[in-house]
Amino acid sequence: MNYLLDLILIPMQVIIVIYTVYYFVLAVIGMWRSRVHKNYTPKNSFAIVVCAHNEEAVVGELVKNLRSLDYPDDLYDIFVVADNCTDKTAEVASAAGANVHERFNKEEVGKGYAMGWMFDRVEKMDRKYDAFLIFDADNLVHPQFMLEMNDHLEKGESVIQG
């Protein structure tokens, strides 16, 4: 009986060991591989869209954070959609330096409608952007974020999630 059990378990263990060694070797090789990261000159323009509903407590900090990024100011604009707000979200965002667009629509409610509405408005503007960046009002962004997005766009990537 033990012989039959050994006949089944030993080949299974050999297969498991082979897979384990294979992935271990891949991990070791991956640790030594040098990754070449090219830093491109900032040239892509971004439309930053922030959708906010009654976010006066946090939207100002986000806009200030976005204004302080390590990226040329003339290559991005910040658009805040104050969606059906009953507080001072629009005033706070505007005071922090954002282009604020207030939207009041009781039938088409929610972030999806607000963002679609804002995308339509931005696309009709005279200035054209290379990419949209989308944030919630309670986000904060690393100072190098837009440089990273620029690098990914320069490599030819069309959709980036960061």
Sequence positions of predicted segments:
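N-terminal membrane-anchoring/stem segments of glycan-assembly enzymes
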Residues: 1-42
